[in-house]
């Protein structure tokens, strides 16, 4: 059997890992299954249990061999396999004879070495007459030995002895029952702990022992014999204590915590120390401060430590039941533990009596009485001095806590030296030992202290001793020495010290930062300010007072230096970040007033300015004050005295000084678990990195970081890399990597100082480092607050290293940031993105500090050294200043040139905007026709670039004259719907462009992406223009984009052939594009670059970001005039020279050496991830139609939550390697043919090349709505498909580029087609029956007299993300044969709307819309000649008078009147209704508005007590278009609320109902949102439930909260689930409780109403209104209920058609299997008492996602005869609906195809859809005509 199976098991696992890795590298997968099974076996709990059991059996054999014959051996095994003795004699002591009869020699069961005379004599000498015990303990496979030790100095021998401090209950040592507290360990594994073994070596022996641990301990004889009787007295309160009151308290945790804190220990008991005001315990009212906790549940906690009690509380779950006691009868006398060494005899001295004439000190004694739950109230610090031996060494009082026992005593002062505690001389004790002695003291503590007389000042802390300054931090004089950590001697900290490594206290070395504070005159105002704030803040903060006397003329003069920077930044030279009343310096501008002081630095907190306290004020108040406060400025700042980092190879050179390395031992026990959600994790795989250490070291610095898996341990993390150091050159180390070993020395649980010593001790040469890389987790993002003192001066040497100070605050600052925090990756690199940008990683914590931005002002070309770095404040008022600045600075002349007639928007380069965490609710409106376009996406924040090692270069070279060109001026573009695009983000940086829309001329072409996402943004509407491509007009002074690249510039970006594939499915980089810049004589190119071979940052997908990036583009330069390059673009190639792996110098040389023109290949970041096909990843989207005769068409885009974050793949150079492609193609084609072998028809596989207009195909769906098909309904004769000749109308698309379209809806197909690359591989099938299945008849061939078109009601354009309207893109205009006017191509992202008839009176759009209407009516009338026509014609009917189309039937001259007070609301119609409010209000809750993605005013809920509920016609989901003549179609949310509130007694509403939007979740945009919930903080959102019905919705989003910072949620979103738990039918209270209780990462499933229907209905209403104005007929369009027409139709059918039996087919039986969670998916109409008359019940609609559609046996118009055998004859509509709703399992329907019913169903469908005159939502169906025209039976 192995000696140490646990260790060997880990070795085997490591071997398996290596083996699997090697096999994977070789591509061998044959052994994967066996290796996985072996691996899982070793990791299984059962296997571990077997190993533990084997060890227990081995241990049992050893125990049994030592038990005397007169003792029984009762034992058992625990469930985990651990050995447990149950014998009474063993329990009370050892399994042996009484001690008086047993000698040490009889109990030596071990080897000859152990039994040797030498060993025995050493042990007996060390025991000094005490009883000797020999103990053998088996170390378990997991966990420790279960006891802690303490080192105390022996007074007799002067040696450090090791004593057992505590045996942990339930541990291995506790179950063995032999090791006792206060036992002295004499030997470990046969090694005596004599003078040859140091304290550290002894600890190492215990920690490194494996297998069996053999201990020899010494114990006092009396202590051993009386142990059984005294143990309880030592660990618990005396049993004789009588409590005056005991009470059982039960608390139900609601997720906010129990609301009380505990302190105490084993001897004093655990008591309630604090009760949080407003917390759970406070609200309950029964628990009181000072209560002793006796029991928790069924667990007796007397004798436990406070930490153990806290753990018991944590394990209780939500319900905590406690037995507490108070008011003890009589005094509780707790006997302090007997000291292990005799107390030193001190001379009996009176208080403050010593020979004062001879000694510089005075000694006095103090008696302190602890109160229950209170500490002594002193904080100590240890110091080992070398300058004055015997004088300064010792333990000193560092500070006194106000209100504590020491404070009330009044005798103890700061800087007093403690020499004895309860008579025990502590001089020479280690700091940790003194802490233990004081903790173990009883209720009354006697302290002996020494104080230097006031006339002398040799104390290690020169400080005033007055009572007023007891909390003041001591100043530290320059003195050689090393501090001991300070400790707060509080009872509540009793257990924390036990977890600290004693070694750390003696090895931490720290260097004090140099004293840079100017000397202050005593008694000066500065000193008074400093003293006042020091008293307020306490010793953890350093207060600094600075005076600035800056010469400032006026604000306008300042603003000349920067149009973007706020006034207070320019005045003070620093930027301030604010959070929760705290204002921190985020950065200091180089050369500014603050920088010249050399006093303040980033992360300092600004407390007061010119007597005005800023602490506690809002950011707006603080910034407003800083703007107006006059100079000189008196600043009061504080800095936290905490630094836990050290540099490995380059320690900072400083003056020898004393620094207090504070280790705070105090803790307020928190019942809630710590939230480790933010802590980084590292891969368990250890990677070995080999570095060659040179004379400069290894070239990196480190810091320690709390281990996320064990809060008591720390790990060593790479902090930063030294520029051009060994580590950076190797490229294998990055900041954030965990350092686990150096050569053979493991750094597991090593302290920072130890790790530093190990690294320094490594000799020069090859060094092997063990590295663990960070795990990549998308839902966990750390926040890095980056501040730099880098001035960006390019004249600095390249190897200059700039210190970058920044930190990661793991805890949200509470109070005054008075809790210690750790640091992580403090030198996280960043990028100064020229002109105005420093990006930070996005933060989800509400404690985040504001975004920052560093700007480099554009210097003159001859003055690069004068660059200044400044900051931009994020206050919203600044943007108004920016706008005014823009208005006062017109664009350059070349942009303001006159232009031809075509309206084109030009991009004004260089005008950049910032949006950063606006806190106000005000909205900045775009001035005049200007629009703000965000040119940078939110995802760009994820990239940070280091400028520490980068040099920037401005190319100011002589160049030849530009080459004139006459090409490239024919391409013009247009922004569509500039006024309606909104920014996607509200809490991120957006760099925008000002675009004056009133400029004319063919100057700039900018193409929008396929999808422009929008989201509600309350602060500032910014507009995003991602991936802008530009084409400039030819000019003698402007760079050109040559004609051979003009087409590429006009199109959405695409990869050229052979550029390689991208591995991620999404890329935030746009594809490479070519930009040509023509040089001009004596003018520089106008760009500066940064970057090189240095790895800038590790991306989240593991890639390394590096390369050459554009830092700045000068406006009036050749590069700036092209508008084709912008800050942040990555340069891949320059005039054929690949720069992807080039150094900075090589890139500079390549640009200098490039000819004329300079040809750049660049990549830009796009606003939304570009979908990359998985097989052929060369993506492209065609450009919009460049038709100059059409008006700007408005296409409202509504985006869901942003797609998951992915990162750009590395760019790969073009490759011409085509080997094997033909074989792969043949193999793929064979698989495709096998896949579709069962489909009827002829399969075709072709490849086409897209042109600028796409493939030239028009697509439509299947006539049968239950089937998903994509048919070709039109082919552009000038398009690639027609030129190829192999595709025909009627072909059904199955695949595009190996992405399957078969069985997909139009929405899915549209998304796939949009991302198709230039070369498209199409798989389609040709079937003769396809034409009859198509929802749209084939488009006619191009002619001057278009033939009639069939019904287009089922058409859905592939070009739109949402359901698109039928528009001019389908058909050519009748009077034009230009290629541009032909059928619109696939993937066009523009939707036509509102064609003006004056411009194109016979346009195809109008013809199609009319034909949709008239043809449908005609088709109905063929069956029924007397079928009624629409009640009134619109303008579209008049347009058709040209004779191109079949004229509609005559109009009924007498339309029925509609009473607005009683008429029902017909789905799909704009209805006018009137509601009398009575004495109550309307009772409506609305959501949406023009300023929201919903883009419409929609009723959210109808309250029962309101007038609308009494009226009964309005439903939740109805859209309100008008209120008493006030148009709400384009109103904001607040405007709509105002209009509804100001209504008179009778309210006239125009409403629109689209029931399909609310029928099921198919009409919700469902997406996931991950929010990180911090401890003690909420998610930052409010919820509300409906008063009637189910569903919980977001009612408000708290500014600065997690939801607000995430930015994806808006008011009105429905919460569908929380962490996978369904909330669709949960109550508001249930959801609120769950959201409060969750911790860490919270995943919300959100449903948001699709905005397409609202936008579509608005378009419909606008069309209708426009038609009314232009109608030739005097008849006003009527929206009379469709019911009337249907009733006429039914009557006509009954009177004119033959008997029913002649029209019926044979009944057929349809079987449906329906689960409880399934939707049946059919809607019915008819029934007894129906508004349509007493007609049979029939199927009005079949939903594609229902179970009924899967049978493919039901059709719209089928009459239902019976349900599960129950006939429906005579049943009402409601009864039939209930039957279907309650039918589950096996459902048998008998249906029959009835032509009468089919005609009614068809007419119902036509009238509800056709009355919209070509509604954009082509597959919207009013499925029913009962009351509100439909009820869904599911």
From Swiss-Prot:
Annotated Polar residues bias: 1171-1189, 1658-1676
Q: Name one Pfam family in it.
A: PDZ
Composition bias (Low complexity) maps to 1410-1426
Which residue numbers delimit the L27 domain?
Answer: 1-65
Q: Where in the cell is it found?
A: Cell junction, Tight junction; Apical cell membrane; Cytoplasm, Perinuclear region
Identify the residues that the record assigns to the PDZ domain, covering every copy: 134-221, 248-328, 365-453, 555-641, 688-774, 1074-1166, 1245-1328, 1472-1555, 1568-1650, 1709-1795
Tell me the GO BP annotations in alphabetical order: establishment of apical/basal cell polarity; tight junction assembly
Q: What SUPFAM superfamilies does this protein map onto? A: L27 domain (SSF101288), PDZ domain-like (SSF50156)
Residues that the record marks as modified (Phosphothreonine) are 1543
In terms of Gene3D superfamilies, this protein maps to: 1.20.1440.360, 2.30.42.10
Task: PTM Phosphoserine: list the residues.
Answer: 455, 459, 482, 524, 647, 1215
GO CC terms in record: apical part of cell; apical plasma membrane; bicellular tight junction; perinuclear region of cytoplasm; subapical complex; tight junction
Membrane topology of the entry: Peripheral membrane protein
The cross-references to InterPro entries, in alphabetical order and at most eight, read: L27_2 (IPR015132), L27_dom (IPR004172), L27_dom_sf (IPR036892), PDZ (IPR001478), PDZ_scaffold (IPR051342), PDZ_sf (IPR036034)
Classify the source by domain of life.
Eukaryota
Purpose of the protein: Scaffolding protein that facilitates the localization of proteins to the cell membrane. Required for the correct formation of tight junctions and epithelial apico-basal polarity. Acts (via its L27 domain) as an apical connector and elongation factor for multistranded TJP1/ZO1 condensates that form a tight junction belt, thereby required for the formation of the tight junction-mediated cell barrier. Positively regulates epithelial cell microtubule elongation and cell migration, possibly via facilitating localization of PRKCI/aPKC and PAR3D/PAR3 at the leading edge of migrating cells.
The record, for PANTHER family, names: INAD-LIKE PROTEIN, MULTIPLE PDZ DOMAIN PROTEIN
UniProt subunit comment: Forms a ternary complex with PALS1 and CRB1. Component of a complex whose core is composed of ARHGAP17, AMOT, PALS1, INADL/PATJ and PARD3/PAR3. Forms a heterotrimeric complex composed of MMP5, LIN7B and PATJ; the N-terminal L27 domain of PALS1 interacts with the L27 domain of PATJ and the C-terminal L27 domain of PALS1 interacts with the L27 domain of LIN7B. Component of a complex composed of CRB3, PALS1 and PATJ. As part of the Crumbs complex; interacts with WWP1, the interaction is enhanced by AMOTL2 and facilitates WWP1 localization to the plasma membrane.
User: What does the entry note on its domains?
Assistant: The L27 domain (also called Maguk recruitment domain) is required for interaction with PALS1 and CRB3, and PALS1 localization to tight junctions. The PDZ domain 6 mediates interaction with the C-terminus of TJP3 and is crucial for localization to the tight junctions. The PDZ domain 8 interacts with CLDN1 but is not required for proper localization. The PDZ domain 2 of isoform 3 mediates interactions with KCNJ10, KCNJ15, GRIN2B and NLGN2. The PDZ domain 3 of isoform 3 mediates interactions with KCNJ15, GRIN2A, GRIN2B, GRIN2C, GRIN2D and NRXN2. The PDZ domain 4 of isoform 3 mediates interaction with ASIC3.
Name-wise, this protein is InaD-like protein
* Species the sequence originates in: Mus musculus (Mouse)
Organism taxonomic ancestry? Eukaryota, Metazoa, Chordata, Craniata, Vertebrata
Gene that this polypeptide is encoded by? Patj
């Amino acid at each position: 059997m192995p000696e140490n199976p646990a260790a060997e098991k880990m070795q085997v696992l490591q071997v398996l890992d290596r083996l699997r890795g090697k096999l994977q590298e070789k591509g061998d997968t044959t052994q994967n299954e066996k290796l996985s099974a072996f691996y899982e076996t070793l990791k299984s709990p059962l296997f571990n249990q077997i190993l533990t059991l084997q060890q227990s059996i081995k241990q049992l054999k050893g125990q049994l061999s030592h038990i005397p014959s007169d003792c029984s051996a009762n034992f058992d095994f625990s469930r985990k396999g651990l050995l447990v003795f149950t014998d009474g004699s063993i329990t009370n002591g050892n399994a042996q004879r009484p001690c008086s009869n047993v000698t040490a020699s009889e109990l030596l069961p071990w080897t000859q070495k152990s039994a040797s005379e030498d060993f025995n004599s050493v042990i007996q000498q060390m025991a000094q007459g005490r009883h000797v015990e020999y103990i053998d303990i088996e170390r378990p496979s997991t966990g420790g030995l279960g006891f802690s030790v303490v080192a105390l100095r022996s007074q007799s021998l002067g040696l450090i002895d090791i004593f057992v401090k505590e045996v942990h209950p339930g541990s291995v040592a506790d179950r063995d029952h032999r090791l006792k507290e206060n036992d002295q360990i004499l030997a470990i594994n046969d090694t005596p702990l004599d003078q040859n073994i140091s304290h550290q070596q002894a600890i190492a022996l215990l920690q490194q022992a494996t297998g069996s641990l053999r201990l020899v301990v010494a114990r006092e004889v009396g202590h051993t014999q009386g142990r059984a009787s005294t143990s309880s007295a030592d660990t618990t309160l005396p049993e004789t204590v009588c409590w005056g009151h005991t009470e059982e308290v039960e608390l139900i945790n609601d997720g906010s915590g129990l609301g009380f804190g505990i302190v105490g220990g084993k001897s004093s008991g655990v008591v309630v120390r604090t009760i949080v005001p407003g917390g759970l315990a406070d609200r309950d009212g029964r628990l009181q401060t000072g209560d002793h906790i006796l029991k928790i549940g069924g667990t007796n906690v007397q004798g436990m430590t406070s930490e153990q009690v806290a753990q018991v509380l944590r394990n209780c779950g939500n319900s905590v039941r406690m037995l507490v006691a108070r008011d003890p009868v009589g005094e509780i006398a707790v006997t302090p533990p007997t000291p292990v060494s005799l107390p030193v005899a001190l001379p009996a001295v009176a208080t403050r009596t010593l020979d004062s004439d001879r000694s510089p000190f005075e000694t006095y004694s103090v008696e302190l009485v602890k109160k229950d739950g209170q500490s002594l109230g002193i904080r100590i610090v240890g110091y080992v001095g070398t300058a004055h031996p015997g004088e300064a060494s010792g333990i000193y009082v560092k500070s006194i806590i106000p209100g504590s026992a020491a404070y009330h005593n009044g005798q103890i002062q700061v800087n007093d030296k403690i020499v004895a505690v309860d008579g025990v001389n502590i001089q020479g004790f280690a700091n940790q030992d003194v802490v233990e002695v004081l903790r173990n003291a009883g209720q009354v503590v006697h302290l002996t202290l020494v104080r230097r007389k006031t006339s002398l000042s040799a104390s290690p802390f020169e400080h005033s001793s007055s009572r007023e300054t007891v909390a003041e931090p001591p100043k530290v004089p320059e003195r050689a020495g090393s501090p001991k950590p300070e400790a707060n001697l509080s009872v509540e900290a009793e257990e924390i010290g036990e977890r600290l490594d004693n070694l750390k206290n003696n090895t931490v070395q720290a260097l004090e930062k140099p004293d840079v504070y100017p000397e202050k005159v005593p008694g000066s105002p500065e000193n008074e300010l400093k003293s006042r704030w020091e008293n307020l803040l306490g010793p953890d903060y350093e207060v600094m007072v600075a005076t600035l006397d800056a010469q400032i003329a006026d604000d306008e003069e300042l603003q000349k230096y920067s149009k973007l920077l706020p006034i207070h930044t320019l005045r003070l030279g620093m930027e301030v970040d604010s959070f929760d009343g705290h204002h921190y310096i985020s950065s200091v501008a180089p050369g500014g007033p603050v920088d010249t002081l050399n006093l303040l630095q980033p992360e300092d907190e600004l407390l007061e300015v010119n007597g005005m306290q800023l602490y506690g004020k809002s950011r707006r108040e603080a910034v407003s004050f800083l703007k107006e406060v006059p100079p000189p400025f008196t600043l009061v700042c504080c800095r936290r005295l905490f630094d836990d980092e050290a540099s490995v190879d380059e320690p900072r050179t400083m003056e020898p000084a004393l620094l207090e390395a504070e280790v705070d031992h105090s803790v307020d026990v928190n019942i809630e678990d710590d939230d480790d959600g933010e802590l980084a994790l590292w891969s368990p795989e250890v990677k070995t990195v080999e570095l060659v250490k040179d004379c400069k070291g290894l070239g990196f610095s480190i810091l320690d970081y709390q281990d996320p898996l064990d809060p008591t341990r720390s790990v060593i993390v790479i902090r930063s890399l030294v520029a051009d150091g060994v580590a950076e050159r190797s490229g294998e180390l990055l900041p954030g990597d965990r350092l686990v070993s150096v050569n053979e020395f493991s750094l597991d649980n090593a302290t920072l100082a130890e790790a530093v010593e190990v690294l320094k001790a490594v000799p020069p040469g090859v060094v092997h480092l063990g590295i663990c890389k960070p795990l990549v987790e998308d839902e966990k993002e750390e926040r890095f607050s980056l501040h730099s003192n880098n001035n960006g001066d390019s004249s600095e040497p390249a190897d200059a290293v700039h210190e970058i100070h920044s930190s990661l605050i793991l805890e949200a600052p509470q109070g005054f940031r008075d809790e210690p925090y750790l640091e992580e990756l403090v030198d996280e690199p960043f990028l100064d993105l020229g002109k105005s940008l420093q990006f930070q990683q996005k933060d989800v914590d509400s404690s985040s500090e504001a975004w920052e931005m560093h700007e480099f002002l554009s210097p003159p070309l001859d003055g690069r050294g004068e660059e200044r770095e400044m900051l931009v404040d994020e206050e919203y008022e600044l943007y108004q200043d920016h706008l005014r600045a823009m208005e006062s600075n017109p664009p350059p002349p070349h942009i303001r040139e006159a232009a031809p007639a075509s309206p084109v928007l030009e991009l004004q380069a260089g005008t950049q905007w910032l949006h950063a965490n606006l806190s106000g609710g005000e909205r900045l409106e775009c001035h005049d026709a200007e629009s703000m376009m965000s040119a940078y996406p939110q995802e760009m924040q994820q990239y940070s670039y280091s400028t520490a090692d980068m040099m920037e270069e401005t190319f100011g070279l002589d160049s030849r004259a530009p080459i004139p060109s006459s090409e490239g001026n024919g391409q013009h573009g247009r922004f569509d719907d500039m006024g309606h695009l909104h920014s996607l983000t509200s809490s991120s940086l957006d760099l925008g462009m000002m675009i004056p829309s009133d400029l004319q001329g063919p100057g700039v072409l900018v193409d929008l992406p396929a999808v422009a996402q929008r989201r509600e943004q309350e602060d500032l509407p910014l507009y995003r223009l991602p991936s802008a491509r530009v084409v400039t007009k030819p000019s003698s002074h402007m760079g050109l984009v040559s004609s051979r690249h003009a087409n590429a510039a006009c199109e959405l970006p695409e990869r050229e052939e052979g550029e390689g594939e991208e591995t991620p499915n999404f890329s935030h980089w746009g594809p490479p594009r070519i930009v040509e810049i023509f040089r001009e004589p004596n003018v520089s190119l106008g760009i500066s670059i940064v970057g090189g071979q240095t790895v800038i940052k590790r991306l989240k997908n593991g890639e390394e970001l590096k390369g050459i990036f554009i830092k700045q583009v000068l406006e009036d330069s050749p590069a700036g005039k092209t508008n084709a390059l912008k800050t942040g673009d990555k340069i891949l190639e320059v005039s054929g020279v690949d720069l992807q792996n080039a150094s900075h110098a090589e890139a500079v040389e390549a640009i200098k050496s490039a000819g004329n023109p300079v040809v750049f290949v660049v990549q830009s970041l796009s606003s939304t991830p570009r979908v990359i096909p998985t097989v052929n990843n060369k993506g492209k989207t065609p450009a919009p139609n460049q038709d100059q005769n059409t008006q700007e068409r408005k296409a409202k885009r509504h985006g869901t939550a942003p797609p998951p974050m992915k990162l750009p793949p590395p760019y790969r150079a073009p490759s011409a390697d085509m080997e094997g492609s033909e074989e792969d193609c043949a193999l793929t084609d064979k698989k495709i043919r096998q896949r579709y072998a069962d489909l009827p028809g002829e399969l075709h596989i072709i490849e086409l090349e897209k042109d600028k207009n796409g493939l030239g195909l028009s697509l439509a769906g299947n006539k049968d709505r239950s089937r998903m098909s994509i048919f070709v309904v039109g082919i552009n004769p000038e398009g690639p498909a027609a030129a190829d000749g192999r595709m025909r109308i009627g072909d059904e698309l199955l695949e595009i580029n190996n992405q399957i379209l078969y069985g997909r809806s139009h929405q899915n197909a549209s998304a796939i087609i949009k991302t198709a690359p230039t070369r498209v591989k199409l798989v389609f099938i040709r079937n003769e029956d396809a034409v009859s299945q198509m929802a749209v008849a084939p488009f006619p061939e191009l002619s001057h007299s278009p033939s009639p078109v069939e019904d287009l009601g089922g058409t859905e354009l592939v070009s739109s993300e949402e359901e698109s309207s039928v528009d001019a893109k389908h058909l050519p205009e009748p009077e034009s044969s230009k290629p541009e006017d032909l059928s619109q191509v696939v993937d066009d992202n523009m939707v036509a709307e509102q064609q003006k008839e004056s411009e194109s009176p016979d346009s195809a759009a109008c013809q199609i819309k009319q034909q949709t209407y008239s043809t449908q009516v005609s088709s109905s009338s063929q069956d029924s000649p007397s079928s009624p026509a629409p009640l009134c014609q619109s303008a579209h009917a008049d347009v058709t008078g040209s004779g191109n189309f079949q004229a509609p039937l005559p109009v009924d001259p007498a339309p029925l009147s509609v009473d607005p007070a009683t008429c029902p609301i017909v789905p799909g119609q704009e209805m006018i209704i009137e509601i009398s409010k009575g004495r109550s209000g309307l009772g409506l809750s609305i959501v949406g508005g023009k300023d929201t993605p919903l883009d419409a005013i929609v009723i959210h809920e109808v309250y029962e007590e309101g007038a609308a509920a009494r009226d009964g016609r309005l439903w939740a989901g109805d859209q309100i278009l008008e209120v008493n003549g006030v148009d709400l179609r384009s109103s904001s949310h607040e405007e709509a609320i105002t209009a509804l509130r100001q209504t008179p007694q009778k309210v006239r509403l125009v409403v629109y109902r689209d029931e399909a939007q609310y029928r099921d979740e198919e009409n919700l945009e469902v997406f996931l949102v991950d929010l990180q919930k911090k401890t003690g903080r909420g998610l930052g959102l409010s919820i509300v439930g409906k008063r009637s019905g189910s569903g919980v919705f977001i009612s408000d989003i708290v500014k600065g909260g997690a939801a607000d910072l995430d930015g994806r949620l808006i008011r009105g979103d429905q919460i569908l689930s929380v962490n996978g738990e369904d909330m669709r039918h949960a109550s508001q209270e249930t959801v609120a409780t769950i959201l409060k209780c969750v911790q860490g990462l919270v995943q919300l499933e959100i449903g948001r109403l699709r905005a397409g229907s609202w936008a579509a209905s608005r378009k419909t209403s606008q069309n209708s209104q426009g038609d009314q104005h232009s109608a030739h007929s005097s008849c006003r369009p009527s929206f009379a209920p469709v019911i009337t027409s249907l009733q006429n139709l039914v009557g006509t059918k009954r009177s004119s058609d033959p008997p029913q039996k002649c029209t019926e087919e044979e009944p057929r039986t349809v079987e449906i299997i329906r689960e409880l969670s399934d939707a049946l998916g059919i809607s019915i109409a008819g029934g007894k008492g129906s508004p349509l008359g007493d007609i049979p019940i029939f199927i009005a609609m079949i939903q594609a996602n229902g179970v009924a559609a899967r049978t493919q046996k039901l059709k719209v118009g089928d009459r239902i005869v019976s349900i599960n055998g129950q006939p429906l004859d005579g049943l009402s509509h409601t009864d039939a609906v209930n039957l279907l709703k309650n039918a589950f399992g096996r459902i048998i329907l008998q249906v029959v195809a009835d032509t009468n019913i089919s005609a009614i169903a068809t007419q119902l469908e036509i009238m509800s859809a056709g009355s919209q005159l070509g509604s954009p939502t082509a597959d919207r169906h009013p499925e029913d005509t009962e009351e509100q025209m439909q009820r869904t039976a599911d």
